[in-house]
Amino acid sequence: MKNYILILIVSIITFDSYSQGTTYAKIFSDFNYSLADVSNPYKEFKVSNAIFGHKHTLNNKFSANITFDVGNNSSGSSYTAFLKLASLKWSPTDRVFVDFGIIKASNFTFMENSWGKRYIYKSFQDVNKWSHFSDAGVGLTYILSDNLIIDAQILNGDGYKNLQDSEGHMRGGAGLILKTDGMSFRVARDIVPRTMYGDEYESQYINTFAMIYTASNLSLGGEYNLRENTSNVIDNTSSAFSVYANLDIGNDVSLFGRYDLSDSEDANENQWNIENEGELTIIGIEKQMTKGVKVAVNVKSFKAATLDGEEEAEANNMLYLNLEYKF
C-alpha cells in the first residue's frame, strides 16, 4: 500500500510538471484526548485524510479533475487510496454546467461549503452516511440568475468506494438555491428507488431545507433533513437538525460552535434507529496560521439518545487539536 501511495504522489507531481493545470493537496490531521477518564484517558495522533488531485482546463468549455483520497477504511488497510473524483465538466454557456464521471454529490455541498470546517467535522448527511461525498453519474447546474440556481443529478447511488450494484439501481435528486442580501436558501429532494417490492418496501426520499446568513464577521447556518422510508423500509422515518455559528474576532481568529440532533420513528412510533442517534455539540476556536494552514482547538461532546422514561445518557467529551494544510 505504501508503494502505491508513493507512486500516486510521484505520478501527480510528474503530470503537473508537463501540463498547464493545477496540482493540489490537502491533509487533515488531529490529536484527540478523551475527557471521560482522567485516570487513564484515551489519546491519539491521527492523519484522517490526505487528498491529492489535478485540475486541468482543456479550453473555455471543457475542464477535467481527478482526485485521490487516502484515508482510513474499515475493510482495507489503515490507509487506503480511493479514486474520489474523476470528472469532466462541460460549460456550453456561462450559465450551464454539465459534470460527468465520478462527481461530487450535491446533497450536502451547500452546507459543507458554508460550514467550511470539514477537517474538524463533516456535515451531518456526510458523517451519518445519508449520502456519499461523490459518486459516478451525471449532474446539471443551471444558473437562472444571480439569485437563483437549480441543479439535478443521476448517480449510481453506491458512492465512490463501491461499484454499481448488481441490479443497476440508481439514485437521483434535484435542488434549488435562492440568494438574497446576506442570505442563501436551499431546498432539495433526493430519491433512492426501492430494490424490493412488497407492502413493506417503498422508495426512500430525503428532503432538505437549509439556510445561510453571512455578515461582515458573523456567519450562521442551519439545515433540517427528513428521510422518508429509510433504506426503502416503508414508514421508517429519520430526521435531523444541524446548526452552526462562526464569529470572526480579528487577527485571523474565529470562535465557532455547532449543534446536531437526530431522531427516528417507525409506523408504530418507535425510535427504531436509536442506537445511532443523539446530540452532538462542538465548541472551539480556529486560527488561520498562514495561507493554506488552519488550526483549531475544540471540544466535541456526544450524548446518545435514550427512550422516554430512561435515564439520560452521559455525554462523551473529547478534546481535539485539528490541522488542515493545503497547497
Positions of PLM-derived features:
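Sec-dependent N-terminal signal peptides
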Residues: 4-13
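Outer-membrane beta-barrel pore domains
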Residues: 24, 28-41, 76-78, 86-91, ...
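Short, contiguous, pocket-lining structural segments
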Residues: 132, 164-171, 175, 199-206, ...
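A short secondary-structure junction signal
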Residues: 151-153, 161-165, 186-188, 197-199
